[in-house]
Amino acid sequence: MSWPRELDVVVGERRIRVRDAGDPEGTPVVFFHGLGDSRLDLRLGEPLAEQLQVRLVSFDRPGYGNSTAAEFGLLSVARDIEAVADQLHVERFAVLGQSAGSRFALAAAVALGERVTCAGCASGSGPVREVGNAMDEFDRTDQAAYELLPHDPAAAARVYAAAFEPLARTIAEGDDDDVVAAFEALLSAADLALLADPLIRADAVANARESVRQGVDGMAWDAVSWLASWPFTVRDVTCPVHLWYGSQDTTPLTHAAWLAENLPQAVLRVWPGEGHLAYKRHLDEMWTVLVACHRA
């Protein structure tokens, strides 16, 4: 068997593209990428995963990378991961979400019960309808989509798709400088300093391009999942949850505080002077914590 490997898991008439890397005999950690990312997001960390005895399972949500485009929400993605774990013969595992992926990681912890041993959330947001002042972050696109929920999520997704098209076109057709420039307004000074590393920069650009291989449907439904009411309460997350943020994070730390207060078993860590991409610097810490939590 070649390693790392990529495979498709079939769910109904859809395929889910999966990347299986790290130590094949290690502690399984299922990774949920952020909005505008893909299963390739942690490729640079795969040698470290192997060293730390982590089996790193990453996948594209519907419409991203090589996964079939489809409407999706928090619980449907959790069921997709159940199918992935079944095909990989992984019974119990930890989950790790970055940014938008964090809410999907928490949904998996609720939906899959004891199969999820512990969860990690890097720069994740809480439910916008519950976190104080979260709606103050809305721009015109968010407001237009919000007014369509909960009655017409497909229309809300179309609103976001139209808004994301120019960015996706730049990512798909522009050179590396164009791609990085397109994200500058969304990142902190700490994040831009991290992207000054040529290896990290090239990897981030390749990951972004993979995310829009099929267009913007994946990003659009991710955005809808951010606006929509969560189909569970965070108090239903019974496993331990580790929360990581940068002090310069573009996810407001009010979300970190809300999650830390409302999750039954939460541990919050804020990295001083770091931003939304801080997880790329701290994989060693995060995986070490999740492995210990999984084995406890």
Identify the meaning behind each predicted range:
Residues 1-20:
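N-terminal cap/lid segment of alpha/beta-hydrolase-fold proteins
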Residues 237, 243-245:
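Short beta-strand/loop motif that positions the catalytic acidic residue
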Residues 92-135:
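Conserved hydrolase catalytic core segment
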Residues 265-296:
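Catalytic active-site module of serine/aspartate enzymes centered on a nucleophile-bearing elbow/loop
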Residues 250-255:
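Conserved alpha/beta-hydrolase "acid-adjacent" motif
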Residues 17-66:
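Conserved HGGG/HGGXW glycine-rich cap/lid loop of the alpha/beta-hydrolase fold
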Residues 76-94:
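Conserved acidic catalytic loop of the alpha/beta-hydrolase fold
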Residues 140-232:
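Alpha/beta-hydrolase
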